Amino acid sequence: MSDSSDDEITLSKESLSALQDFYKSREVEQQDKFEISEDWQLSQFWYEEETSKFVANVIEQETIGGNVVVCLSTPSIYKVLHKNNNLLLNNNLFEYDKRFDVYGEKFHFYDYNNPEDGISEQLKGNVDYICLDPPFLSEECIEKVAKTIALLRKPTTRLLLLTGRIQWNNIQKYLPEMMICEFEPKHPRLQNDFFCCSNYHSKLLGLENKK
C-alpha cells in the first residue's frame, strides 16, 4: 500500500460535518472579536446590551429552523444573533456601514435612499422575519424602508420595528398593520422616547394597550 502524500484523504460524512462546524465556529469567533464603534454621522447609536440580547432572543424564539431573517439597520442585534451561532436560521444584515462586511456573504450593503437596489433574487419575497430600525426619524425614511420591506416580505412575514415614538404616525401610514409593543428598547446615550411595534402578537414583546 502506498503511503505517498499524494494519496487522497476521504472523510466520512460525520467527520466532514464536524470539521465544517469547527471552521464555522472559529469564523464566528474571529468575526465577533471585531469591535465596531458607533458612528454618529451615520446615525448609529447602539442599544443597551440587554436590549440587543432580548430582541435577538425574541427573533430566535419566534422563528423556526430554516427561516430567513433580515436585520435591517440593526447591526448590534445581528451581532448577537451571529454570536449565538444559530445554524438553523439564515441570518442576514442589511447595513450602510461597510465596516460590517466582516460578516462576509451575510452582509448586504443597504442605502435606504435607494430602497430597491442590491437585494438578491434569493431574498426577494422569501424573508420570514425582518427586524428593523430605520436610520433617521423622518417620514421619508419610513416610506423608503417600507418599499424595501415590500420587496423582501411574503404574506406571513413577521415584522419588528424599533424607533422613536415620534414616528408612530408615519409607521401607521406606510405599515398600517403594526401594533405598539409593551417592550421598550433602551439606548445608553439617547434620551428620545423609543418604542417598538410588530405586525404579530408576541407573548415576549407584549402589547402596549394590554398593560
Swiss-Prot record:
GO terms for biological process: methylation. It comes from the Eukaryota. Its EC number is 2.1.1.-. Disulfide bonds: none annotated. Keywords: Cytoplasm, Methyltransferase, Transferase. Belongs to the class I-like SAM-binding methyltransferase superfamily. EFM5 family. It is found in: Cytoplasm. Its main location: cytoplasm. The keyword Transferase applies. This is Protein-lysine N-methyltransferase DDB_G0272708. S-adenosyl-L-methionine-dependent protein-lysine N-methyltransferase that methylates elongation factor 1-alpha.
